[in-house]
C-alpha cells in the first residue's frame, strides 16, 4: 500500500491517535482476515493492550531494530512477533511514523465459534493463521488484514493492567468488553469497582 493510499484509509484517523486512545477506539471493531483461496474470517475485537514510547514494556523502548521495525509505523502497519518460540501476537501501529506505539489485539470474538478460539493473542493468531509473514503488511481492502467498524453497542468497558509483563506492570493500559466470553483474563476486582457489583 502506498503512503497516499494509507492516508486515505478510513482507519488512519483512528490509528493516528496515541496507543492508549486507539486501544479503546478499536474495541468492537472487526478484524478481517482474507485468505488467498477467497475465504474471509471476521473477529470482533474485545480486548486490547496499549504500548507507547517511554513505556518500559514496549518492544521499541530502547531503539528500533530489524525485529521491531513494524511497530514504528506508520499507523495502520501490522506488527507481528513471536513469543516462547511458538505463539504469535498481532499489533497495529499507531500515532505516527518513526514512533514506537502500537495496540496489541489481545482477544477476538468469532461468530458461531467457541469463545476459546480467540481468547488470547496466541490463540487468535493461530485461528487466523497469522504469523511473521504478515509482519510489516498493511490494513486495507486488498490486504490479508483489514478492519470493519463496530456494528452494535459495546456494553461495559473495563480498564485494568496488562498481562504477562515484568516492566510497566502498574500501567492500566488493558481494556476489555465485560460481556464478551472471549476475554483472555478477567480482573474481577476492576469489574467490581467499575460495574458496581460484588466480587
UniProtKB/Swiss-Prot annotation:
Highest taxon of the lineage: Bacteria
InterPro entries recorded: Formyl_transferase-like_C_sf (IPR011034), MPG (IPR003180), MPG_sf (IPR036995)
Single GO molecular function: alkylbase DNA N-glycosylase activity
Pfam family, one: Pur_DNA_glyco
EC numbers on record: 3.2.2.-
Database matches in CDD domains: AAG (cd00540)
NCBIfam families in UniProt: 3mg
Record family assignment: Belongs to the DNA glycosylase MPG family.
Name by which UniProt lists this protein: Putative 3-methyladenine DNA glycosylase
Organism: Synechococcus sp. (strain ATCC 27144 / PCC 6301 / SAUG 1402/1)
Amino acid at each position: 500500500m502506498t503512503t497516499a493510499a494509507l492516508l486515505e484509509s478510513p482507519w488512519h484517523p483512528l490509528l493516528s491517535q496515541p496507543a492508549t486512545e486507539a486501544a479503546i477506539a478499536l474495541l468492537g471493531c472487526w478484524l478481517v482476515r482474507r485468505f488467498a483461496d477467497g475465504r474471509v474470517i471476521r473477529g470482533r475485537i474485545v480486548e486490547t493492550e496499549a504500548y507507547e514510547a517511554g513505556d518500559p514494556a514496549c518492544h521499541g523502548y530502547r531503539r528500533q531494530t530489524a525485529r521491531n521495525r513494524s511497530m514504528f509505523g506508520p499507523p495502520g502497519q501490522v506488527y507481528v512477533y513471536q513469543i516462547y518460540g511458538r505463539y504469535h501476537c498481532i499489533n497495529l501501529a499507531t500515532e505516527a511514523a518513526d514512533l514506537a506505539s502500537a495496540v496489541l489485539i489481545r482477544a477476538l470474538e468469532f461468530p458461531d465459534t467457541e469463545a476459546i478460539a480467540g481468547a488470547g493473542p496466541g490463540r487468535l493468531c493461530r485461528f487466523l493463521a497469522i504469523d511473521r509473514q504478515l509482519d510489516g503488511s498493511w490494513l486495507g481492502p486488498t490486504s490479508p488484514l483489514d478492519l470493519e467498524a463496530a456494528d452494535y453497542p459495546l456494553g461495559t468497558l473495563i480498564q485494568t493492567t496488562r498481562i504477562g509483563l515484568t516492566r510497566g506492570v502498574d500501567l492500566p493500559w488493558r481494556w476489555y468488553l465485560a460481556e464478551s466470553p472471549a476475554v483472555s483474563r478477567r480482573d474481577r476486582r476492576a469489574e467490581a469497582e467499575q460495574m458496581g457489583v460484588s466480587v
